[in-house]
Curated annotation (Swiss-Prot):
One of its GO terms (cellular component) is cytoplasm. It is found in: Cytoplasm. It comes from the Bacteria. Keywords: Cytoplasm, Elongation factor, Protein biosynthesis. It holds the Pfam family EF_TS. Gene3D superfamilies: 1.10.286.20, DNA helicase RuvA subunit, C-terminal domain, Elongation factor Ts, dimerisation domain. One of its GO terms (molecular function) is translation elongation factor activity. InterPro entries: EF-Ts_dimer_sf, Transl_elong_EFTs/EF1B, Transl_elong_EFTs/EF1B_dimer, Transl_elong_Ts_CS, UBA-like_sf. This is Elongation factor Ts. The keyword Protein biosynthesis applies. Belongs to the EF-Ts family. Residues 81-84 are annotated as: Involved in Mg(2+) ion dislocation from EF-Tu.
Length: 352
C-alpha cells in the first residue's frame, strides 16, 4: 500500500512521534493506522526505558492555587534539556500532572504512580510521555498546602523555574487583601531564597557552626577593608535571635544605660535612645536570620523593614493578626548534579 504524506502527518499529529518514525511504522503496518500506532507504542516503550536511565536536571516548576486561596500545589518536574522544558507538550504534561496531584489529594510519588489519570495508570502515562517527548521525565517532588481556615497564595516566576507558596492564619482579615499581600511575600521569597520561616527552626549545633563560619567570613573581609582604609565590619557575638536570651537583652540595656550615663546624656531621654541602640545590637547579631529566614529578611519592596515588621504593619492596617504558617520554595535542579559532556562525545553517544 502506498504511504501518503497525509497519512504520515495524521499519525504524527495523533502520536507526537517523529516524521520518519511515523513513516516506518506505517510501512511496517502496511498502511493500517491503528496497527501503526501500536508499532510506535511498542517501539516507544523500548526507547522510553533507555531514556529513563538518563539524568533529568532541567524542567519546570508549577504552582496551582485554587480560586478561594484555600489550597495550593507546587511541583517540580524534570526533563533532560532546557529545550524540552520549553516544549508545549512538556508544559501541558507538567500542568496536567500538577492539577491531577491537587485534585486527587496525592501526597507521594508511589501514590502518584499508582493513580489513574484519564483512565490510565500514571506510571504508564509518564512512560508514554517519555516516548512522545523524547527525553527522560521525572516528577521529582511536589507538595500541597491546605490553608485550614487561613489564606494562602503562590507565585511562579516568569521563567517557570522558581515557585513559592505561602500560607497564613489571618484573623478577621479580608481574604482577597490577605491573598494579595501573601503574593508579595511569595515574590520576595522567590528572589531572596529564605530557607525557613523563622529563627525558631534553627538547630543549636547548626547555629554554633554558622557563627564560627560567619566570624571567619567577616574577619576575612576586614583584612581587605583595612587594606583599603575603609570602615571594618562588626564581628558579632551571635548569629541569630535564637541565641539571644532575655537575660542577654537586659545586660545589653544595662550596658547602653552605662554608656549614656558616661556620655552625660540626661536620664529623661534614655528611654528614647535605648530602643534604637538595642535595635542596632540585634541587627548586628542576627545576620544569619537576615540571610536565611523569611521573617528576618529585609523586604525587597521596602528594604528599611524586615518581613516581620511589614507583617505587623499589615496586621494593624487590615485589623487582624497575620501569622505565616507554611512556606515552600522550589527551584529547578536544586541539589541535582548536572551531567557534563563535551559536544563530540554527546553526538557520538546519540549516533550509537
Amino acid at each position: 500500500m502506498q504511504i501518503t504524506a497525509k497519512m504520515v502527518k495524521d499519525l504524527r499529529e495523533s502520536t507526537g512521534a517523529g516524521m520518519m518514525d511515523c513513516k516506518k511504522a506505517l510501512v511496517e503496518a502496511n498502511g493500517d493506522m491503528e496497527q501503526a500506532i501500536k508499532v510506535l507504542h511498542e517501539k516507544g516503550l523500548g526507547k522510553a526505558a533507555k531514556k529513563a536511565d538518563r539524568l533529568a536536571s532541567e524542567g519546570l516548576v508549577c504552582v496551582l492555587v485554587n480560586s478561594d486561596f484555600s489550597k495550593a500545589t507546587i511541583s517540580e518536574i524534570n526533563s533532560e534539556t532546557d529545550f524540552v522544558a520549553k516544549n508545549d507538550k512538556f508544559i501541558n504534561f507538567v500542568n496536567n500532572t500538577t492539577k491531577h496531584i491537587q485534585d486527587s489529594n496525592i501526597t507521594n510519588v508511589e501514590a502518584l504512580n499508582n493513580s489513574l489519570i484519564n483512565g490510565e495508570k500514571f506510571s504508564d502515562f509518564i512512560t508514554n510521555q517519555i516516548a512522545t517527548i523524547g527525553e527522560n521525565l521525572v516528577v521529582r517532588r511536589f507538595n500541597t498546602i491546605n490553608a485550614n481556615g487561613g489564606v494562602l497564595n503562590g507565585y511562579l516566576h516568569s521563567n517557570s523555574r522558581v515557585g513559592v507558596i505561602i500560607s497564613a492564619t489571618c484573623e478577621n482579615v479580608d481574604r482577597k487583601k490577605a491573598a494579595d499581600f501573601i503574593y508579595q511575600l511569595c515574590m520576595h521569597a522567590a528572589a531572596m531564597k529564605p530557607s525557613v520561616i523563622s529563627y525558631k527552626e534553627f538547630n543549636p549545633d547548626f547555629l554554633k557552626s554558622e557563627l564560627t563560619a560567619l566570624k571567619a567570613e567577616l574577619e576575612k573581609e576586614n583584612e581587605e577593608l583595612k587594606r583599603l582604609g575603609k570602615p571594618l565590619n562588626h564581628i558579632p557575638e551571635f548569629a541569630s535571635r535564637a541565641q539571644i536570651s532575655d537575660e542577654i537583652i537586659e545586660k545589653e540595656k544595662e550596658k547602653i544605660r552605662a554608656e549614656l550615663k558616661k556620655e552625660g546624656k540626661p536620664e529623661k531621654i534614655w528611654d528614647k535612645i535605648i530602643p534604637g541602640k538595642l535595635e542596632r545590637f540585634l541587627a548586628d547579631n542576627t545576620l544569619l536570620d537576615q540571610r536565611l529566614t523569611l521573617l528576618g529578611q529585609f523586604f525587597v519592596m521596602d528594604d528599611k523593614k524586615t518581613i516581620e515588621q511589614v507583617i505587623d504593619e499589615k496586621s494593624k492596617e487590615f485589623g487582624g493578626k497575620i501569622t505565616i504558617t507554611n512556606y515552600i520554595r522550589y527551584e529547578v535542579g536544586e541539589g541535582l548534579e548536572k551531567k557534563s559532556e563535551d559536544f563530540a562525545a554527546e553526538v557520538a553517544a546519540q549516533i550509537g
